């Protein structure tokens, strides 16, 4: 069982292919043949006027005509949890023509409202002749295709930009691509010699099947490394192999010199999202499917004039069906069997609308994989009015924390950072995954199988790399590959000293099925209800449930099984540094003393200057001058007293009278930095050196001063303290001994604890 939840309903109604040549726009193809919006969710605030909209594009991204970044980063995925909200500003680019609007009002997406001057008999007669002249594939949602082709063919200013049109409750979203002014589809680039150091992961072809085609996702992340490594930039890269792999481009671009050559194509996705989820559903479909599919077609069009040839083939089949008066089903059967582009669009619709991975083949040398990333975890429980996903992994472990360093690699999923300290948890049986890999017969298969056999959920990527001699970068690529294909999940390494509890988000409705599956996997172990009952008690380390050393392996397998199904989650500890009033007062007094000292030094410096200026005077004069200055200084309010008066005024406010928490110690303000310095200066540390030699299991000199700087960056409330041993390379025993000494809520058994050490406030949650 797996806790990976498929994405919500993508709200996909249909997919349309629009092309434009010098002869005008053409509605080439749509799938499914008879789209329906009857089952779509109702919306109270319908849009009545079509209005094209597009998102703002930065000069370096979608809206850059001469840049090749859009056609070269076919594998890049936007930043799952993300977490990656972007503000989209929609700009109106006008409204459809009066004729189109009139036809829309008459038809009303299939309505039969008659014109004022038309009699019912004339209406029926014209309707019958219309059916004879126009076959069913020449209409879409009750309107003629000539209406849609005008509406969905934007101007060249929308080149490689998000094109969005609203018609009633439907939203039409596309990524139009226009031919360049020189008649080509992309800039010519100099060929680069293949580097001698390329590994098998850099050259492995796609495998092209949803079940066994693991190479797509793996190379997807291989190509998402920093493009500027080794001096290469985005503009120097060939189209990424993650989503598309094509034969070499001999001349950089292919053009058709005929009079009716194509100048634009636009694959439009028709969606009907709920009002409250409109922006989210549109964005995730555009970022993960629409834009990437458009980039793939753009590359193939530049290479082999692919889109234009397929469009001509589709139009020819439809024209032949018109002449032969073929049925709609027979025409679509022929289209799907003879046109790879029509088949690809149909596959995308069927897969994306059911929240699956769409694996498509454009040419024998070109394959793509598209998907809307699934939900793998949630950091919070849903509210009364929020959608619930029972069984989803409840954790904050894969959320970006304050100290996380953004790596060079991204992947398609809610986790934005695939850190080297994570481990890989397979979501299905290892044997079945290895069987699928062997059946795929890809060049990525052997290293992928080797990594799966070497991987354990108790070992991090860095540890597996050290043990198996697999480069860490390759391990991250292979792990991200399995995650992309929904066969694994990145988790903190399982450890018996960690605490695990029954997840509040577990799906108890599946307890019966899960119990049967659990008994098949662990027939001699305690039953699933018993394990859940034990873990529901007072939280304690998982090691306390393991009866003996011989049972450690099987109990780790049980824990992995429970984590995989979302039945348990790790209870983690988070902390902040507390600054009490006494420490604040001490720092304020120190600051006041320093300021008074600085003023005295400035005053002494100005006095010395006056004396030097009056040097020619007699000794009496100098004495008089000095006495005058001293008298003036004595008559003024003393600096220290004035500052104390100011501080007394400040103390009347609440912030100076209450304790504070330092939320970001690694980015502390100047005042917070002084608080931290004062805290560490108060730590008593002399008695620890003597105790280090009294016990053999006391691991060296446990000095808070020594580890304070390494620990403080984790005291931000977002980084679990369980990360410290893994990331700092320290033993868990040493780390928790130190943390228990400074934790306000704990009393370690080391002996007397000094009051000044208690500065850490901790909480526990997932």
Swiss-Prot record:
- Please give the biological process terms from Gene Ontology that the record holds: cellular response to amino acid starvation; meiotic cell cycle; negative regulation of TORC1 signaling; positive regulation of autophagy; TORC1 signaling
What ranges does the record list as Low complexity composition bias? 51-61
**Where along the chain is composition biased (Basic and acidic residues)?**
118-133, 217-250
Q: Where is this region: Disordered?
A: 33-140, 186-257, 594-638
Domain of life of the organism in this record? Eukaryota
Q: What does this protein do?
A: Mediates inactivation of the TORC1 complex in response to amino acid starvation. Required for meiotic nuclear division.
Q: What is this protein called?
A: Nitrogen permease regulator 3
Q: Which gene encodes it?
A: NPR3
């Amino acid at each position: 069982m797996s806790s990976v939840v498929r994405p919500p309903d993508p709200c996909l109604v249909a997919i349309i292919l629009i092309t434009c040549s010098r002869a005008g726009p053409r509605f080439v193809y749509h799938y499914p043949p008879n789209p329906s919006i009857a089952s779509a969710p109702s919306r109270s605030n319908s849009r009545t006027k079509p209005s094209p909209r597009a998102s703002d594009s930065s000069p370096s991204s979608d809206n850059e005509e001469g840049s090749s970044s859009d056609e070269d980063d076919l594998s890049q995925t936007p930043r799952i949890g993300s977490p990656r909200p972007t503000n989209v500003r929609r700009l109106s680019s006008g409204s459809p023509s009066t004729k189109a609007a009139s036809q829309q009002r008459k038809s009303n997406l299939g309505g039969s409202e008659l014109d004022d001057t038309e009699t019912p008999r004339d209406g029926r007669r014209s309707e019958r002749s219309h059916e004879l002249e126009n076959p069913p594939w020449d209409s879409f949602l009750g309107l003629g295709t000539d209406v849609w082709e005008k509406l969905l063919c934007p101007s060249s200013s929308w080149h490689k930009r998000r094109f969005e049109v609203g018609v009633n409750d439907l939203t039409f979203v596309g990524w139009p691509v226009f031919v360049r002014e020189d008649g080509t589809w992309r800039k010519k680039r100099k060929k680069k010699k293949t580097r001698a150091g390329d590994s098998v992961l850099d050259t492995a072809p796609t495998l092209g099947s949803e079940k066994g085609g693991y190479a797509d996702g793996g190379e997807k992340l291989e190509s998402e490394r920093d493009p500027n490594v080794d001096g290469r930039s985005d503009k120097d890269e060939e189209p990424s192999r993650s989503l598309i792999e094509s034969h070499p481009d001999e001349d950089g671009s292919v053009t058709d010199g005929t009079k009716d050559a194509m100048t634009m194509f636009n694959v439009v996705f028709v969606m009907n999202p709920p009002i409250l989820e409109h922006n989210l559903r549109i964005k995730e479909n555009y970022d993960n499917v629409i834009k990437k599919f458009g980039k793939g077609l753009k590359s193939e069009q530049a290479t082999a004039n692919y889109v234009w040839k397929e469009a001509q083939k589709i139009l020819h089949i439809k024209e032949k069906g018109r002449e032969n008066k073929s049925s709609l089903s027979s025409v679509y059967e022929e289209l799907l069997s003879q046109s790879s582009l029509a088949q690809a669009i149909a596959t995308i619709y069927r897969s994306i609308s059911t929240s699956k991975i769409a694996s498509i083949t454009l040419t024998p040398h070109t394959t793509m994989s598209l998907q809307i990333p699934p939900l793998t975890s949630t950091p919070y429980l849903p509210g009364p009015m929020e959608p619930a996903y029972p069984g989803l992994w409840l954790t904050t472990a894969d959320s970006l924390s304050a100290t996380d360093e953004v790596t060079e690699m991204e992947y398609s999923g809610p986790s934005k950072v695939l850190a080297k300290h994570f481990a890989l948890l397979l979501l299905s049986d290892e044997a079945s995954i290895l069987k699928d890999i062997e059946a795929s017969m890809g060049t990525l298969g052997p290293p992928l199988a080797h990594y799966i056999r070497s991987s354990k959920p108790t070992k991090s990527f860095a540890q597996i790399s050290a043990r198996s001699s697999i480069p860490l970068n390759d391990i991250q690529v292979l792990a991200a590959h399995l995650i992309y294909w929904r066969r694994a999940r990145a988790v903190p390494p399982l450890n018996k000293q960690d605490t695990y509890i029954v997840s509040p988000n577990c799906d108890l409705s599946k307890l019966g099925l899960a119990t049967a599956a659990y008994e098949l996997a662990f027939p001699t172990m305690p039953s699933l209800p018993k394990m859940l009952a034990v873990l529901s008690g007072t939280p304690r380390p998982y090691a306390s449930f393991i009866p003996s050393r011989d049972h450690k392996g099987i109990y780790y397998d049980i824990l992995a099984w429970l984590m995989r199904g979302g039945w348990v989650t790790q209870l983690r500890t988070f902390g902040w540094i507390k600054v009490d009033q006494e420490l604040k007062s001490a720092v304020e007094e120190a600051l006041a003393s320093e300021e008074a000292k600085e003023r005295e030094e400035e005053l002494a410096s100005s006095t010395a200057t006056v004396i030097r200026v009056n040097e020619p005077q007699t000794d009496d004069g100098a004495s008089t001058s000095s006495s005058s200055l001293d008298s003036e200084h004595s008559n003024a309010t003393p600096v220290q007293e004035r500052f104390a008066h100011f501080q007394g005024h400040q103390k009347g406010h609440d912030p100076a009278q209450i304790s504070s928490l330092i939320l970001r110690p690694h980015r502390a303000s100047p005042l917070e930095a002084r608080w931290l310095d004062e805290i560490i200066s108060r730590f008593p540390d002399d008695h620890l050196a003597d105790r280090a030699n009294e016990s053999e299991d006391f691991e060296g000199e446990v000095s808070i001063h020594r580890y304070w700087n390494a620990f403080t960056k984790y005291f931000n409330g977002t980084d679990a303290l369980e990360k410290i041993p893994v990331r700092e390379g320290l033993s868990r025993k040493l780390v928790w001994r130190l943390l228990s000494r400074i934790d306000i809520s704990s009393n370690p058994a080391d002996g007397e604890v000094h009051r000044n050490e208690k500065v850490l406030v901790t909480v526990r949650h997932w």
